């Protein structure tokens, strides 16, 4: 069974686009960069106007791992609350005596039990939309000496294609999302990833992995006209594009591919 989502509500949400941009930048800050690139950052993120095609494959109960995650988070919050309570008791000795009458004053972790309203969907997600990521970087030329020249470049990542199975679980006012595996798709399996529209086209030569999430993408680079004919600059640009392609795929796999997931908690607004 297929259904539509109100994608326009998401793509017009500037806060969501900015949140994703900041999350990507946080990941890049913890990524070791090669010697030929520095100051790598995401300048802009746009979800685009074309949403994914989603097909519902199965409805089940949520996986135990999601309940375990909620319990672990609740236990951690309870431990932190009790630690804060002990700190405040040390500040006021008179209140300390009253608070040590028994364990009843300690914070207790809430019991997380499955509810009849808990539900999990197995979804087939196909995306060939117009998402756009704009990245800025400084290209470092280390010849004839180290850091001989630094060139600012701007890269655009577009034409992203994916076709995967994922699970979406709703429980305890929280939503969990994780990708399980890629789905065979001739349009993507045969597609060639363009890393330089004016240079050679690089095609994937390895067998399809269990999960790539991103199966195709295009990277375009803008550099000053005075450097476009220099072989060393073009080689560095090609290496940078390949590096971006790799870390972009790695980011999605680490953040979204099972056994990892993203978790949206809607309990914060409750009093």
From Swiss-Prot:
GO terms of biological process kind: mitochondrial genome maintenance; mitochondrion-endoplasmic reticulum membrane tethering; phospholipid transport; protein insertion into mitochondrial outer membrane
Biased composition (Basic and acidic residues): 82-107
Record's keyword annotation contains Iron: no
GO-annotated molecular function: lipid binding
Protein's membrane topology: Peripheral membrane protein
Chief localisation class: mitochondrion
A GO CC term assigned to this protein in UniProt: endoplasmic reticulum membrane
Sequence segments annotated as region (Disordered): 73-108
HAMAP family: Mdm12
UniProt-recorded name of the protein: Mitochondrial distribution and morphology protein 12
Organism: Saccharomyces cerevisiae (strain RM11-1a) (Baker's yeast)
Phylogenetic classification of the source organism: Eukaryota, Fungi, Dikarya, Ascomycota, Saccharomycotina
Name of the gene encoding the protein in the UniProt record: MDM12
